[in-house]
A protein has these predicted regions:
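C-terminal non-catalytic scaffold/interaction domains in large multidomain proteins
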Residues: 1-217
């Protein structure tokens, strides 16, 4: 009987007899191996163990030695997130007193604008990911304009249920939002269209306003 990789992973995650040892490796829990916490957490652990600051090169070498199934480019991607501060070849974790980087204004994002009623309008390409219901990247100026700063999350109510928008400082794909598939279907959006979304940051709502070229409202 064929067993999918997804089914195997689901079984491993739900079995206390096994522990994740790296991105792709699992081992028996009774071997007393530290559980792999993901790239961001492993980086934070190593920075803390080094006294709060460590050479970027030394950190990379340590991670690659401990987790040979992780690429250096992936580690560097996480080091470039807001969770870390790289200074002169060394890295430390961002502190509460560290200011966030300056975020560009909303008008730097193509298709995004403030409306006179206080809402924020954006357009997103209707891709296979949108139609499949995948989560989507949100441009930082958009997240800021709708009230989602780094480290925060917010649910926007729609006619089809809430759509979360979150900005995890340790997540390379952040800020991001949940599925808008139902919003796209509601206005008959098709692959290749530009879906118009309207956020109301005051009341916390989100709606689709048609597709560009055939706006409905």
């Amino acid at each position: 009987e064929n067993t999918s990789a997804r089914a195997v992973l689901k079984a491993l995650h739900g079995n206390a007899a096994f522990v994740r040892a790296s991105r792709t490796r699992w081992t028996l829990a009774d071997r007393e191996v530290f559980a792999y916490g993901g790239i961001a957490q492993e980086l934070k652990n190593r920075v803390a163990d080094a006294g709060g600051r460590v050479s970027v090169r030394a950190l990379l070498d340590d991670m690659l030695d401990a987790f040979p199934d992780i690429k250096e480019s992936s580690i560097r991607t996480y080091l470039a997130t807001l969770a870390f501060v790289v200074e002169g070849g060394t890295v430390r974790c961002r502190r509460p007193e560290d200011p966030w980087p300056v975020i560009p204004s909303l008008n730097t994002v193509r298709g995004a604008s403030h409306r006179s009623d206080g809402c924020v309008r954006i357009t997103i390409p209707v891709t296979t990911q949108v139609l499949r219901g995948s989560g989507l990247f949100v441009e930082p100026p958009v997240a800021q304009a709708i009230g989602v700063a780094p480290g925060l999350s917010r649910d926007f109510e729609t006619a089809h249920g809430p759509v979360p928008v979150a900005w995890d400082p340790a997540e390379p794909a952040a800020p991001n939002m949940g599925s808008v598939r139902q919003l796209a279907h509601a206005v008959d959006a098709e692959l290749g269209d530009l879906l118009v979304l309207i956020f109301d940051p005051v009341v916390g709502t989100l709606r689709a306003d048609g597709v560009e070229g055939k706006i409905t409202g």
